């Protein structure tokens, strides 16, 4: 039993939806913590609003609540469940903030705060308290000023000067912060920071921009035992958020004395905070001098990286410590024979590189500052820094543009952006020196020299290739494909020369002790540490870095597939490179490979491992794109491995527009008029034949990348170039646009003979908004029984015609009563977790068993009719990305999702909106501005809002139209008509809901300004008529009902 015997039941707060600054690392941390606490015989109650996480699976905790993460709702759960303790440190910034709020509400009476004490939360998050504590214990901090109102700005400016770094209190991933170089920038960032801070507090500190950034991950228990789990150094200097920076572990550029100084400081700080559990401490370092920058008294993104980098299960150990165990009483489950008080040792180099959404958002400001913009990250492991850098860049799976103009390179290097790290290689290719590059970037010369080493080998390979040099280049992380490109040699000659890589273990102890659950990375040395069993083995490809269009949903599917296969006695191995996820946890699979997910890396593992099968269905579009190449390589090398599930050729039928159209025609299934164009000329001819507007998109891409709705030939000219560039080996797909259609998503599984439909989801936004960005609902709300029957019939016909074995997602549109098929994806989709949580059907688990050859009839699952309503709503990243067009369209923009469950649509939609931080007000002022052709559609919505007691505001045209229909509305000036206008109302917080649909190009500028202001001031906004109708239903329902707060099992039973 744990030392704290008073604990019988513990509440764990999750982190909510995936968003910039808070990604899958908390799914991993919370899932590990639940397991760790339950092992000690303590009941766990979990609350989280994210349906896409393993954490919200019914089997993760004793009770799972998928409710909005709001203090009043959690207070109600506490009343109902009466937990003895609350674990706040596993839910990221959200968990800490909510714990502080619950305490301030008086909701934690009789509930122990475990692990991270309240004082530590306040000292770590409140900038003023943190500053006082550091001064008290004699730790140096940058000169700073704390303000709580904008009127203090002049005083702060006089005291701190410029440049200055702005850090709001209680915010996530540096939200609302930044670096100010002018007084105008200072005012803008501080105003924004004050609105983002929970306590309306901002720290302005002297800039230590250009200093090295060093981090320590520290663990402490109740007996005051402290250990350093991992030291990490940021390649990017201070001024760039650590979540954005390239990070290297272990610390390599400091002397042992310098390392020792900061190690002692880190231990002193965690003791002063009295944290029991994990803590992340960040320092700025410059020529022997250092400053304490910040403390995260919780599990963080850096903790996830440190955990995967060392193999030390930080979240698991932190949870055990929080419930009273000491480090020497906790076993390290990786070795199975050493206690958790042993500091990890590493004999390799780990590199983390972030992934940004700028391929989606061309207009976003790409400058990296103290406020995060990245959506995910990859981790690579090598024996050298050089190998780590090369493997990390390969793992990103992005196009890296080569710069050949020195002036352009100097400009890119002079400010931190997502392009700077790969451009360092270009600088050395063109002969710049380490000193020149350092002067522009302030990047530690140690790392610049490593990049120069890579470039030196690259240039030698190009100019003087030898067999010895080729072998050397492999140790520096070069792929065979790169070597072929540089040398011009035949790929088979290279492969026969270098052979296969060796695989080394990550085991927390540099192989001092035998490891029970190690994971592996490839390198080019003599001794291979892999061992083989005679069990049946399957390799599953993961989904890599979280990006828009390919999020945590695919990791959820991967983990479910692993669990399902292990139940069947299969030895399951995973290939993935995302350090944040549950799939890369030490004990999820029988073996984990931390590797790039390129064809060469996959095939090397297949050749080394004697696999019976490989599964590509669960890792999203990137894994599916490898299906045909993997099958060709399997034939080439004569391997026994099979690509399991739907055949790669049938996957291609679904992607190839012409082949798929033939299949639909054979089954008499309608689809919108469409065509495939291989050239611009063909595209114009197809679009003219179909008639504008048309949807144009490349094939074989995820998240609707480069998909656009184009209205005329001029727009097509602009967009077709982008689409062709994105997918130059595949045709561009052009479809008729079905305006005002109702869009549907269907997730199903098939064994090749029978089809089980998991759920039919109705989109709340109209067709034309990417399915990943639209809210959706199960069961459907407006479809007739005949339409539902048609959709199910078409789903069965398509799945069987495609020979689907496993999962399939099909998108439909209902236009003027006709059901049209838009597309089919015979793989895991981003809605699989939502459908599983809504219905209780574990679709990914079922699919994995079917891919083994089992039949649906033997598994005993049936389609489910549910009596409740589940709504999925999305989280959009616009508050993080200034300059981005916030209007939804056919290209996906959301980063994560939430779920709302209740017994009618209105309450479920209200809960989903609340969980997505777009809470619909139940009273106040509503601003309405719609296009002329939508005025009749807004009429019933405006009337209902007025009848519900709202005051309506609008511009002249809307006011006149509503007056003609006896609905009073207050007149507001348009933006270009001068003040006071709608922007002034937003800034004064005098408007509580905006319904503003985008108009033509002339009105769009106004619309964008209004949208941006509403985002900055956190005012809920709606941009479609369909969304406005749903909001009115929510308000009506909430006026007459209260929301239901029950565990997920209550709905499934």
From Swiss-Prot:
Residues 131-323, 661-852 form the ATP-grasp domain. ATP 2 binds at residues 697, 736, 738, 743, 768-771, 811, 823. Binds 4 Mg(2+) or Mn(2+) ions per subunit. One of its GO terms (cellular component) is cytoplasm. Mn(2+) 2 binds at residues 294, 296. It catalyses: hydrogencarbonate + L-glutamine + 2 ATP + H2O = carbamoyl phosphate + L-glutamate + 2 ADP + phosphate + 2 H(+). Mn(2+) 3 binds at residues 811, 823. It comes from the Archaea. Its EC number is 6.3.4.16, 6.3.5.5. One of its GO terms (biological process) is glutamine metabolic process. Residues 918-1053 form the MGS-like domain. InterPro entries: ATP-grasp, ATP_grasp_subdomain_1, CarbamoylP_synth_lsu, CarbamoylP_synth_lsu_oligo, CarbamoylP_synth_lsu_oligo_sf, CbamoylP_synth_lsu-like_ATP-bd, CbamoylP_synth_lsu_CPSase_dom, MGS-like_dom. Residues 398-530 are annotated as: Oligomerization domain. Residues 531-919 are annotated as: Carbamoyl phosphate synthetic domain. Mg(2+) 3 binds at residues 811, 823. Mn(2+) 4 binds at residues 823, 825. CDD domains: MGS_CPS_II. Pathway: Amino-acid biosynthesis; L-arginine biosynthesis; carbamoyl phosphate from bicarbonate: step 1/1; Pyrimidine metabolism; UMP biosynthesis via de novo pathway; (S)-dihydroorotate from bicarbonate: step 1/3. Mg(2+) 4 binds at residues 823, 825. Mg(2+) 1 binds at residues 282, 294. PANTHER family: CARBAMOYL-PHOSPHATE SYNTHASE [AMMONIA], MITOCHONDRIAL, CARBAMOYLTRANSFERASE FAMILY MEMBER. Large subunit of the glutamine-dependent carbamoyl phosphate synthetase (CPSase). CPSase catalyzes the formation of carbamoyl phosphate from the ammonia moiety of glutamine, carbonate, and phosphate donated by ATP, constituting the first step of 2 biosynthetic pathways, one leading to arginine and/or urea and the other to pyrimidine nucleotides. Composed of two chains; the small (or glutamine) chain promotes the hydrolysis of glutamine to ammonia, which is used by the large (or ammonia) chain to synthesize carbamoyl phosphate. Tetramer of heterodimers (alpha,beta)4. Belongs to the CarB family. The large subunit is composed of 2 ATP-grasp domains that are involved in binding the 2 ATP molecules needed for carbamoyl phosphate synthesis. The N-terminal ATP-grasp domain (referred to as the carboxyphosphate synthetic component) catalyzes the ATP-dependent phosphorylation of hydrogencarbonate to carboxyphosphate and the subsequent nucleophilic attack by ammonia to form a carbamate intermediate. This is Carbamoyl phosphate synthase large chain. It comes from Methanocorpusculum labreanum (strain ATCC 43576 / DSM 4855 / Z).
